[in-house]
Amino acid sequence: MTEVNDQAGLTAGSLCTGYGGLDLAVMAVLGARLAWCAESDRHAAAVLAARYPGVPNLGDITALDWAAVPPVDLITAGWPCQDISYSGPGAGITKGTRSGLWLTIAAGLRQLRPAYVFLENVAALRTRGLGKVLADLAALGYDTQWACLRASDTGACHRRDRIFILACHPAAGAGLAAAADPGRRGVQRRGVRGILAGPPGPAEETRP
């Protein structure tokens, strides 16, 4: 498992990065530094190159040699939701589907063993694959907490219900709550800090 360097701050790696929104939130709350990202879409990759000059983009995660990927303290991933979403085909997390990229992510976690993992997907994951994700993380030794949050919970004018999953390895120590600086950049962090502070309450878990 990656040893966390408290003096240098957390290093982060990002899988299925997209335009990097999840990473912006995690870095804003935790002060983490993005060491590398992995995004194959050329348009999103152009955004990342402009936003994070000098940060290597590892590209297609299905083509990665995980043994050659630099270890980091924290890995984020917001993998494709098409087969999980209620508006999609409903295949869930199965090999050969877009949402089946979770299987590739899990293989990467098995090799890299970061201290922390932060995941995001549509709230429908609760009934279309959450058990698989939690089981895979548990098999790797992670303690996991999750919560469903709407964009409107942070003041946005739209619903956009999403599930956020935080996995911590027991060897990492006291957890991430101490790393979350309430004064960082004035960012709204009700949801993220709620996950860091402890398990979600029943109201958060059962939102439709």
Cite the ranges covered by each PLM segment.
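Generic enzyme active-site microenvironment
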Residues: 37, 58, 76, 118-119
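Class I S-adenosyl-L-methionine
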Residues: 2-8, 64-74, 82-208
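Glycine-rich, N-terminal phosphate-binding loop of Rossmann-like dinucleotide-binding domains
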Residues: 79
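Structural recognition of the beta-strand scaffold that forms the well-ordered cores
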Residues: 13-15, 76, 124
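SAM cofactor-binding core of SAM-dependent methyltransferases
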Residues: 12-64
